[in-house]
Amino acid sequence: MKFSVAFHDRPNFWHLGTISLEFTIFEAVPNGILRGHENVTLYLSKSESGSKQKHYDVLIIGSGPAGYTAGVYTSRAKLATLIISGTLPGGQLMTTSEVENYPGFPNGIFGPELMMNMRQQAERFGTMVVDDEVTKVNFKKKPFMIMTHSENYTAEAVIVCTGASPRKLGIPSEQQFSGRGVSYCATCDGPFFKGEDIVVVGGGDTALEEAMFLTKFGRSVKVVHRRDSLRASKILQVKALENPKIEFVWNNVVSDIKGDKKMATVHVKDISSGKEKTFNAGGLFVAIGHEPNTAIFKGQLELDDKDYIMLGNHTRTSVEGVFAAGDVHDHRYRQAVTAAGFGCMAAIDVERWLSERKHVKK
């Protein structure tokens, strides 16, 4: 039996992976939390290798807040629902240490725990969740065909919830300190850096918005930008340049991040002279954009110039019967709570669309 697992062995650091277990003792808790060693918490979720059923009323591609919420709503509407979770079951929140801004949790909640709760809630109403990755889709004919590494499925309706991934710096130490100082969301993690010196990487609207937001918490904020001018809107530039807590480091790129259990210094390099500088910093926020996870939908769905899925009427895509929710379309808000609301809307749209076409017997 396989379980998806995220375990926490030090503050703000999560390991992710899939393990195989032969111990029947775990049968009693196929979805739950096991606490063992002093600082180790395991979030376990039973991983099905496939589903005996191959045709569904609704197939949801991707998990996370949008996918799981959509599953809750479609299953409660008595629609046969399958979620194919993707490469990281639970999405980006599986790499977030603590979530403080999701309603209903006054003391905050660990990202993996929130995702396990959402998954269990969807499964409670009958949603089947398969931990696999979609490799190809065919939306040219109905029923829609969705192919994974291990199985092929068909569905009357599809909800795409594949999200978007933050662009990375591409240096080895970035992954090493991810969750231990390196972050990709100031709104999510800013409050954890009170009194710290902070570095923001980027020169667009997002970078400046995050820099200004972080001045509420950090002792100082340095914005490292590879050019000598900003791409951000003029009004944001004026606000950021006039902010006494923000300092700009022009024509530089981050070359390394160093520290012990947590990052302590950021190393930058001048792209013209090659001269290097070192800054003490407790946090590094990478704000160089996001990339929607839409590669498999090219030629199948209409995408915008940044490859985000375009929506027409509500959550409907360019293909009748295919809907989308969450960060795969939303490149403005990118919050767990907005993704969950988006998933709810898509599920309601799907239910009404299927009901109108009488695909499901009432």
Would you name each region that the model predicts?
Residues 64-65, 88, 164-166, 205-206, ...:
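Residue-level detector of alpha-helix initiation sites
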Residues 48-125, 196, 208-234, 304:
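Beta1-alpha1 glycine-rich phosphate/pyrophosphate-binding loop at the start
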Residues 152-248, 257-258:
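Predominantly flavin-linked oxidoreductase catalytic cores and closely associated redox partners
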Residues 122-148, 152-155, 215-313, 352-362:
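A Rossmann-like FAD-binding core segment of flavoenzymes
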